[in-house]
Amino acid sequence: MNIISVGVNHKTAPIEIRERIALSEVQNKEFVTDLVSSGLASEAMVVSTCNRTELYVVPGMPEVNCDYLKDYIISYKDARNAVRPEHFFNRFYCGTARHLFEVSSAIDSLVLGEGQILGQVKDAYRIAAEVGTAGILLTRLCHTAFSVAKKVKTRTKLMEGAVSVSYAAVELAQKIFSNLSMKKVLLIGAGETGELAAKHMYAKNARNIVITNRTQSKAEALAEELGTNRVLPYESYKEHLHEFDIIITAVSTKEYILNAAEMQQSMAKRRLKPVIILDLGLPRNVDPEVGALQNMFLKDIDALKHIIDKNLERRRAELPKVKSIIDEELIGFGQWINTLKVRPTIVDLQSKFIEIKEKELERYRHKVSEEELKRMEHLTDRILKKILHHPIKMLKAPVDTADNIPSKVNLVRNIFDLEEPNQSLQ
């Protein structure tokens, strides 16, 4: 009984290799189904994202090892001309479990503490469960991984603090204004960065978001997605600057789109009510002199990156706590695996002694009263429990390596002359 894992991720392979190995959901279902239906695996699951494609497999045949699985997925993806075995990592036994726990808890992510990965692992398990390739081992492994992720989220601060520019901008605005639901927001630029910032704002209860963009249809599409349906023509948005408490700029331009003179006029109309300008452009969208104006808080990408660096430093400080949680869960999972491996021997041992007990009691069934027979059954049950206590305890006891399990199982089976067990869980 073994769970092995091979795969490529952001640590082992560049993006052009990861792209060649990635599986769509349809391919994922087909791949794990083929592995199990062919008998190559008794259980199989694949986690496939933009940063990783990882196989988690319970082999069904002796020849199915890490090298075999690497070759199998390379062939499946017809990628022999680009992908080599050295692009993959290998994991075995508890190493496989530790790796999935680290992935699920987001300490193996490209961005430390990035919470999206847990949902992707859950999707991988859902796919395997739907097609019937997640059996007792992968089911227990995945649910333990989900438990690890939950404990990491509730017991540590690993996922706290912004680690993207767009989210850091929104977090900063919330720190300054506290309640964003009462503030009016202008987003200048509806590209990827602007869209992320707007969605983060919306998630923080900012509902009064107005969008302007050179291509108005793009602004309208984002406004509709957010449910604000509020758009300003790009040619005239400067006439309304004084109306906004928060201005986010995220456009591609070589010249400043906002200068000090324009913002000074806007502040006069606002009677110096504070304004935050979050400049997410590169090159910068806003003249740095704007930041010198009274009650004008200007933050550019460098200022936001400083916040991100501090947050990442805080996240890294949480790693010992996270690893302690993983170690704790790994011990429990390893003990469960060991118990599963020795369970057939424990059942056989108990069955043999019960059979001996019943045969001996049968000899006296017609020689003693019903009451005496019950007392004899009770007495022999207690004796058997005490006799079997130590062998069963020894079988269940943790071992240093999985290789030691067969030796102690064989010892017990030989001592008590037990027949060979069913090999399905060995």
Swiss-Prot record:
Source organism (scientific name): Chlorobaculum parvum (strain DSM 263 / NCIMB 8327) (Chlorobium vibrioforme subsp. thiosulfatophilum)
Superkingdom of origin: Bacteria
First and last residue of the signal peptide: none
CDD domains from the UniProt entry: NAD_bind_Glutamyl_tRNA_reduct
Assigned EC number: 1.2.1.70
Record-linked Pfam families: GlutR_dimer, GlutR_N, Shikimate_DH
GO biological process: chlorophyll biosynthetic process; protoporphyrinogen IX biosynthetic process from glutamate
Protein name as catalogued: Glutamyl-tRNA reductase
Keyword hit for Nucleotide-binding: no
The gene coding this protein: hemA
